[in-house]
Amino acid sequence: MATPPSQVRQNYHQDCEAAINRQINLELYASYVYLSMSYYFDRDDVALKNFAKYFLHQSHEEREHAEKLMKLQNQRGGRIFLQDIKKPDRDDWENGLTAMECALHLEKNVNQSLLELHKLATEKNDPHLCDFIETHYLDEQVKAIKQLGDHVTNLRKMGAPKYGMAEYLFDKHTLGESDS
């Protein structure tokens, strides 16, 4: 049975609707990756509780991003079509530096996708979608990328992963004192 057209839909191009659904999938994938990271660092043979806490917080944030997009999709009269969520590329995150580097790469990919979504919204003359992306996503992405870049730099300066003490101290003093 075909889905009836929305009575609230206005100036919402089907390409934007499809792109929002792809972005929802990407945000859920990012949440899934961070969840994998979190429980890797929570393992008894890894035991870096603040890395685990940090990545769990990131997982929740990414899921909230997906939910915000789902709410937008309904508000604009679009239809949500969920896709399979790809499993993370790895199950063993090796060490804190590797995980932070992977997280940085992931956030840059999410940011690029958001920039492309913004470009599409501009091309389709959708100021509401442009404003939504600018207000709720772009600034937060830039801050997340900067924070992860700083974490990668500090872990490298401390000698991670060669010196295990570096990760322990980073876990305790950097991640242990942060709000996330």
Curated annotation (Swiss-Prot):
Assembly information from the UniProt record: Oligomer of 24 subunits. There are two types of subunits: L (light) chain and H (heavy) chain. The major chain can be light or heavy, depending on the species and tissue type. The functional molecule forms a roughly spherical shell with a diameter of 12 nm and contains a central cavity into which the insoluble mineral iron core is deposited.
GO molecular function: ferric iron binding; ferrous iron binding; ferroxidase activity
Tagged with keyword Acyltransferase: no
UniProt source species: Gallus gallus (Chicken)
Gene Ontology terms: cellular component: autophagosome; cytoplasm; cytoplasmic vesicle; lysosome
Residues reported to bind Fe cation 1: E27, E62, H65
Reaction catalyzed: 4 Fe(2+) + O2 + 4 H(+) = 4 Fe(3+) + 2 H2O
Family: Belongs to the ferritin family.
PANTHER family xref list: FERRITIN, FERRITIN HEAVY CHAIN
Keyword set includes Magnesium: no
EC number: 1.16.3.1
The name this protein goes by in its record: Ferritin heavy chain
UniProt KW keywords: Cytoplasm, Cytoplasmic vesicle, Iron, Iron storage, Lysosome, Metal-binding, Oxidoreductase
InterPro entries found in the cross-reference section: Ferritin, Ferritin-like, Ferritin-like_diiron, Ferritin-like_SF, Ferritin_CS, Ferritin_DPS_dom
